[in-house]
Amino acid sequence: MSFEDLEDMYGAEHINPTLDPLDGSLRPPVIKKITAAPERGNMTALIPEITGRDIVYSIGHTEATYEEASAAVASGATMITHLFNAMRPLHHRNPGVFGVLGIAESLPRPYFGIIADGIHLHPTSIKIAFNSHPDGFILVTDAMHLVGCPDGVYDWTNGERIIKNGTRLTLAGTDGKIAGRWVHSFP
């Protein structure tokens, strides 16, 4: 993967600074954050180019090992999207992405988003994450476009369908794979 591939994916006009037509100054890219798996393609090598455009690179949707996640942080990744979700689980011999929250190898510790909705994570997992790096802890929702819709089955991306049942969203045809959460706000 190259930066040109990212330009094709996101649109060059959205991922690069542009000139303001009124005063000729450089405007930052429209895209402010990219979440990607650092072990895929050539992504870790692209992190400095991404962050050099004032775009936050967030580790997520990943099978990255601790070493791969550490390399991403060393290259400029400053965030983890939805810690513990859609990523390699914590293992005692390879802590995966979670391991970069510890103080090691003089790397900065990234911020991390946690979905604390009672469905995505066990409360103890949330406490462990918070206690590992309280200054990096960010509460996020996994709210989706179905907010306010009645219970039912809805079309999603790539021909998949989502089942909305109360506040729980699951992917149709699976054994309850979490697809998101519907919430008004935190209590």
Functional labels for PLM-detected ranges:
Residues 46-50, 59, 68-187:
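Active-site-adjacent C-terminal substructures of enzyme catalytic domains
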Residues 1-95, 148:
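Histidine/acidic-residue-rich, glycine-tolerant segments that coordinate divalent metal ions
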